[in-house]
């Protein structure tokens, strides 16, 4: 999961590409040129650099091993300008994706839960217990105060140019988050997006100053709740397949939610003999969860079809495996859609992608 990072990365990449270009500003936009620059940015490592990382755990790594990992797609690389270039996180990903390499790294460094995992070990049982006790799905409120800051590097944008900035802001039409309170923004003039917009944002703009970074920030509060639906198979009622809502969320949506013959066959295999939508979704979820380890992802726009990419490469980040799950659910007649937002933990937050089926 990395949606907000990808958004900021895309903006930064566009700024860098524009600033570094020596061609006429009047040249029309060309996706192929843009794609090429994005690939160069993502695939920026040489073989010797990747080997240096691998040697931290496998000191005697061989060329033969490198070729084997490349063939298995555990080590991600591609040819650009006639040169083999490796994904910027190819080394770390190898030790997440390849089971033997994973075991070697764990043997050397051990395992310890992250800060968010430690919080979840306490918070998730609290939510489940509260749902069972109170008999409702939304429980355990926590008041959050958030300061979000975005900094554009010094001279990344020519002095005098206006920088337009959209920062995330809590939606107010979601039952699990309430009492949103705006406190402050870095600029005297700002605009909130309409409640009808798909994304909730606060918009500001500022003129770039030579020799100085451009800083945008906002502060707000809201109450976040835990949410858990203790579903049973018998709770699921037949779908009304005639509604616009059902049709929208069981339809193909190019270019990533495509019902290819390969995915249709896979969905049929995973759900064979099952008629209950909840149990179908559970089968699909368990298969995706058990077979595709998390790995840092290249930019989504450079991938032709993300679910097929996940199948081919046998790994994905949270958004990529979500798209595989969504596509398999929709093929199976189960409504599903993509969502993104923030995991909020004490003194930290993480941009994250998830889904709803």
For the regions a protein language model found, what residue spans apply to each?
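C-terminal motif of bacterial Sec signal peptides marking the signal peptidase cleavage site
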Residues: 18-19
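Intrinsically disordered, low-complexity N-terminal segments that are enriched in acidic
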Residues: 32-229
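Cysteine-centered nucleophilic/redox motifs
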Residues: 165, 284, 313-343
